[in-house]
């Protein structure tokens, strides 16, 4: 619910969301999608091949003709390579396992090339090696200046990879601290 609200998919009950210092409500839809990539925890499984689905991440960058440029195709290829799904380009999404689908949706979010990634349970459905690869990739993107916000229920993953952890309980923010400080606080 928190990430869906931040992504503008649910109305806020209070407060405001800012993206890069600007009120999120002031963005046009495509403009917001160029600034923020959102991957919800629960997604549909359309009857579509992997390449076509990943291409949907380029929507905010396409002009009126909706034709992809060489730069768009390059962004799709890079995202597919980074997530290890390039070999599945012609496979139907419905033929893939849950973990494989998860990687395809992550590729779609990455090829959007926004400065801010909101990912709800991105490591769900992934086996341990793929979880590690994903978290390393996201840490690398954060190191390159992207804002990466994850919902994780695995505290060990959050402690190992997060720069800051927000601890929520009963809909209330209990703390937002670097991992070592959160651990030392005893919360």
Which residues does each PLM region occupy?
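Conserved ABC ATPase "signature" region
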Residues: 55, 70-88, 113
């Amino acid at each position: 619910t928190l990430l869906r609200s931040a992504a503008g998919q649910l109305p806020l009950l209070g407060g405001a969301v800012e993206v890069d210092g600007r009120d999120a409500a002031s963005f046009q839809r495509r403009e917001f999608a160029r600034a923020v990539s959102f991957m919800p925890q629960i997604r549909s499984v359309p009857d579509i091949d992997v390449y076509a689905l990943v291409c949907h991440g380029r929507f905010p960058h396409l002009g009126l003709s909706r034709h992809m440029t060489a730069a768009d195709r390059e962004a799709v290829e890079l995202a597919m390579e980074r997530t290890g799904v390039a070999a599945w380009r012609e496979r139907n999404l419905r033929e893939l396992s849950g973990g494989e689908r998860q990687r395809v949706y992550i590729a779609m979010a990455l090829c959007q090339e926004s400065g801010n990634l909101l990912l709800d349970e991105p490591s769900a459905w992934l086996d341990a090696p793929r979880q590690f690869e994903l978290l390393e990739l996201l840490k690398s993107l954060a190191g390159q200046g992207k804002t990466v916000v994850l919902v994780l229920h695995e505290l060990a993953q959050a402690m190992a990879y997060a720069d800051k952890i927000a601890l929520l309980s009963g809909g209330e923010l209990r703390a937002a601290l670097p991992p070592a400080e959160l651990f030392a606080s005893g919360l």
